Amino acid sequence: MELTVGRVVKAHGISGEIVVEIRTDDPAARFAPGNTLRAKPSRGGPERSCVIESAREHGGRLLVRLAGVTDRDAADALRGTLFVVDSAELPDIDEPDTYYDHQLEGLQVRTTGGRRVGAVAEVLHTAAGELLAVRDDADGAPREVLVPFVSAIVTAVSLDDGLIEIDPPDGLLDL
């Protein structure tokens, strides 16, 4: 499975740097100088390998210099490009109750009472913590509920069973 670790937003300056929107929990490791990332153009075209020459944080994003990208035109041509890695390349997580986003996405969510809530569509990372965006369109009307990914609410996660069990506070599922 391919995981997106960054997206090129725009060129920065005239020397070929690009602004990258971060989509990984460890940008320092993913965008370390010397690393090679697969780049998928947004406008179609062949995938290519890009070698990171340098990366630095800038306003919540990264300014990245790639080997062979030496001017603004070359950098601007990368706008919208996604940097991806294969999930098989990710290291195993040794901490209990810690997951990669892609492991949670698609899992079914049920309450401790057995009520179906939906499936995890996305894991949102906010300043206040992680939220599970749980979507359900079983009754014909698409619905999304944001569930805080905290132990007080998420009582069990079973990757083997494809299930997350929650004990939501009153009103959470009614919002």
Curated annotation (Swiss-Prot):
The keyword NADP does not apply. The keyword Chaperone applies. Pfam families: PRC_RimM, RimM. GO terms for cellular component: cytoplasm; ribosome. InterPro entries: PRC_barrel-like_sf, PRC_RimM, RimM, RimM_N, RimM_N_sf, Transl_B-barrel_sf. One of its GO terms (molecular function) is ribosome binding. It is found in: Cytoplasm. Residues 96-172 form the PRC barrel domain. The PRC barrel domain binds ribosomal protein uS19. Belongs to the RimM family. An accessory protein needed during the final step in the assembly of 30S ribosomal subunit, possibly for assembly of the head region. Essential for efficient processing of 16S rRNA. May be needed both before and after RbfA during the maturation of 16S rRNA. It has affinity for free ribosomal 30S subunits but not for 70S ribosomes. Binds ribosomal protein uS19. This is Ribosome maturation factor RimM.
